[in-house]
Amino acid sequence: MMRTRCIISLLVVAAFMILSQPAIADDLADLKATDQGFWKAWNTGDMETVFQIWQDGGIWLPANRAFPDVTNSAIGKQMFTKWFETHMYWSIWHKVDYKVIGDTGLVWGLRTTTAIVKATGTGKRFFYKTTVVYVKSEGKWQAVMSQDTPLISEADIF
């Protein structure tokens, strides 16, 4: 009797694990697409899309502390809009990993960021370890926290 219960319990657990795998795979694919969409929007200065993905009240911990922590507020939108009017800016992930745990998505990796002042053509390149935390809310992934940690000092590129 005890043996039968153990076998049934194991079968139930195995069935649950097998059935939950497609949902995890779908969540992982959605997380990757959302994160890639965020950086595409960021790299093209599409602040509307950036602030659709960035959750109101989200925390940004920049490496250089040149900007305040940003939320989806009028001040944050205005600051970044002004920044993109005067700079060309893009970020590239070199090695990125994704993990989904329930309704929480984790993205971490190595990132290179380039910023060029449009008026002068001078620029800098930054090298970071970046971690972004997403939360799935109403079927959509939203970034709630991002932290950049510099790997080496910034480099003048022009």
Region roles according to the model:
Residues 86, 114-124, 152:
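Short, cysteine-centered beta-strand-loop-beta hairpins and adjacent loop/turn segments enriched
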Residues 127-154:
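Short beta-strand edge/turn micro-motifs at domain boundaries
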Residues 103-115, 128:
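A short hydrophobic beta-strand element
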Residues 28-30, 47-102, 122-125:
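A solvent-exposed, acidic/Ser-Thr-rich amphipathic alpha-helical stretch
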Residues 1-11:
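Bacterial N-terminal signal peptides that target proteins for export
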Residues 12-14, 18-56, 103, 155-158:
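Short, low-complexity N-terminal intrinsically disordered segments enriched in polar/charged residues
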Residues 98-106, 121, 134-140:
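A short, structured loop/turn motif at beta-sheet edges
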Residues 54, 111-113, 147-150:
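Short beta-strand segments enriched in hydrophobic/aromatic residues
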